[in-house]
Structures are given as structure tokens and as C-alpha cells.
Regions:
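Domain-level signature for soluble enzymes in the chorismate/prephenate branch of the shikimate pathway
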Residues: 1-227
Length: 227
């Protein structure tokens, strides 16, 4: 079981959950080693260096959706995926967000993850576009930025997904403090941000995914691939 994880604040509730969830010891050992940004994790997954993980939605397009499927979802706004300025520039750490910017026909620099949050909370003028907000304005659907995908051990990941889905995770003070120091964000800002993120893929979320995949097809936006 080689599980890879996005090293962003949006995975903080999962980090807390997995610490106490019963897994083989090597699962958590590998997880600690394999933390990176989305586009790098996609590459590791497509080349089978890992066999499971929360990967970008654009890279997980061929994987089946189940009632228990998990994702990284934002409804109406996300705060951590922004387009700023007028000069086009993709974020090298991103895959789905770059594609979403293209699908929405935007011009500007894409910022994702912790650096986008730093920009959001330090920019009182709010002179940026929140991609989840614009997606909702156009589609009236949530946007799924990432998906839990796996090549094997389906029963294990089904149990894990259901457990995470039904457990309300409270983030301990010391973990919030560590995250605040690491990201240069305030604890209250982190908690505010996490209120915008959820992980269940219900009917609306699956419709949102399908709408995104249609946009990729119609606008001929390239998906990550092995070769």
C-alpha cells in the first residue's frame, strides 16, 4: 500500500483522521514520506510509484465513482485557487486548477494551495478571481479539485472512505499551531478556510465532475498522461 498525499492545508482533516485510523504500519510510514504537490503526485500515480492517493480530478477522470467516493470539494468559493493579474501563467504545482482556468476562459496567473491562501488573506481589496466561485456562478455546481483514486485494495479504501466520511474530525490546537507556523497564516484563517472544504462526492458533486470532464473534452484541454 503506497499512498501519496497532497501536502496542503485542505488535507489537514484527513491528516488528523488517518493518525488514529487502523492501517498497516508501513502505510503510515510511506504516507509520511510521500507528501507533495498535486501535479507531482499525479505523475507518481500515473507511473505507479504510488498505488493510491488524493490526486487531481483531471488525472482521475478514468476512475469509477461510487457512493462512498471521496474528493476535495469546494462549494461557491474555495479561497485557495485564484487567478490574479492579467498576465497568463499556470501554477506548476497544479493540474485541475490550470485546466479549470482554461475551461472558464480566464486570463491571469493561477495560484493554488498555501500561497493562494496567503495572497487571499493579505489582500483586502480582493482583486482576484476565486475559481470555485466563478464555476458555481456559471454551473450552479460544486467543483471537485481532487479525488481519492486507487489501483488496488478496493475494500480497504472503501472502509477508510466510509470511516472518514462519517467521522467529524476536530483538529487539535497543537496541529493548528504547527500549520500556522508552516504556512504563515493565522489559526483562525486556517479554520475559516477549512469551512469551505468538504470531502463527500454526492450527486451534485458527481454532476460537477462530469460537467468539468465535458468542458475538458469540448475545449480539447489535455489531461495528464503517462506518455
Amino acid at each position: 500500500m503506497r499512498f501519496g498525499k497532497i501536502d496542503y492545508l485542505n488535507m489537514l482533516p484527513f491528516d488528523v483522521f488517518i493518525k488514529s485510523y487502523p492501517t498497516p504500519c508501513y502505510f503510515k510510514q510511506f504516507l509520511r514520506l510521500k507528501k507533495t504537490y498535486p501535479s507531482k503526485l499525479n505523475e507518481s500515480f500515473l507511473f505507479r510509484r504510488i498505488d493510491a492517493g488524493f490526486i487531481s480530478s483531471i488525472a482521475g477522470h478514468s476512475f469509477a465513482l461510487y457512493p462512498y467516493s471521496l474528493g476535495i470539494v469546494a462549494y461557491k468559493e474555495v479561497l485557495s485557487v485564484l487567478v490574479v493579474g492579467t498576465k497568463n501563467a499556470f501554477d506548476k504545482e497544479s493540474a485541475s486548477s490550470n485546466a479549470l482556468s482554461q475551461a472558464l476562459g480566464l486570463k491571469g496567473e493561477v495560484l493554488i494551495g498555501n500561497k493562494a491562501l496567503q495572497f487571499y488573506y493579505s489582500n483586502p481589496k480582493k482583486d482576484f478571481i476565486d475559481l470555485a466561485a466563478l464555476w458555481y456562478e456559471k454551473k450552479r455546481l460544486p467543483f471537485v479539485f481532487g479525488r481519492l483514486c486507487y489501483y488496488q485494495n478496493k475494500d480497504f479504501y472503501k472502509r477508510l472512505s466510509l470511516a472518514f466520511k462519517h467521522q467529524k474530525t476536530k483538529i487539535p490546537y497543537y496541529i493548528l499551531k504547527e500549520a500556522a507556523l508552516k504556512t504563515n497564516l493565522k489559526r483562525q484563517d486556517i479554520l475559516h478556510y477549512l469551512q469551505k472544504i468538504y470531502y463527500t462526492l454526492g450527486k451534485k458533486e458527481q454532476l460537477g465532475l462530469k460537467a468539468f470532464y465535458r468542458e475538458l473534452l469540448f475545449k480539447r484541454i489535455q489531461k495528464p498522461k503517462r506518455f
